[in-house]
């Protein structure tokens, strides 16, 4: 566990940022923190609620703030992964070390299950979902998209999250969709 900003302090930070035309994103893990940040005017969440299932109150707060974006950054399923498909793409000793570290972790499985249910429900309720990963470059974005589908989003919705919604979140008007005048 780590120290967190108080609602008064993060509210002041959000207000000050907005006065200067800046948007604010915060890491969130708990339902109560999400509610407080939504009330304070947060623009986007990195990660998602993983301590308990979302309730009607937080859904109403999201409805009141339709421009808020959720970037789930799912924590990984917690199940040992078969990484053999990486053979030949990275040094064999690194692959062996990665496979040895990939073990079943019950706590991670529980957190993934909660966050996956919440992602599915928030997506179904119309919350804008964008894309991010804490796994670094390379194959991890693909694993993140697979986890988003495993969580209950449709493959099409995941592609929209990874392209259009992410470009919109980053205010990259020339990216995100295949349209005349945009970079492909």
Where do the language-model regions lie?
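His/Asp/Glu-enriched, well-ordered alpha-helical/loop segment
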Residues: 103-184
């Amino acid at each position: 566990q780590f120290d967190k900003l108080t609602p008064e302090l993060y509210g002041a930070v959000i207000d000050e940022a907005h006065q200067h035309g800046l948007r604010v994103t915060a890491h969130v893990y708990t339902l109560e923190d999400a509610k407080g940040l939504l009330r304070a005017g947060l623009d986007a969440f990195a990660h998602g609620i993983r301590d308990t299932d979302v309730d009607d109150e937080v859904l109403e707060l999201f409805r009141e703030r339709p421009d808020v974006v959720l970037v789930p950054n799912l924590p990984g399923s917690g199940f040992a992964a078969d990484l053999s498909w990486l053979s030949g793409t990275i040094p064999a000793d690194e692959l062996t070390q990665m496979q040895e570290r990939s073990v079943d972790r019950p706590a991670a499985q529980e957190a993934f299950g909660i966050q996956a249910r919440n992602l599915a429900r928030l997506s179904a309720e119309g919350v804008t979902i964008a894309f991010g990963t804490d796994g670094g470059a390379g194959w991890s974005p693909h694993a993140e998209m697979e986890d988003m589908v495993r969580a209950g989003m449709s493959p099409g919705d995941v592609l929209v999250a990874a392209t259009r919604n992410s470009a919109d979140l980053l205010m990259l008007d020339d990216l995100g969709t295949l349209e005349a005048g945009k970079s492909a």
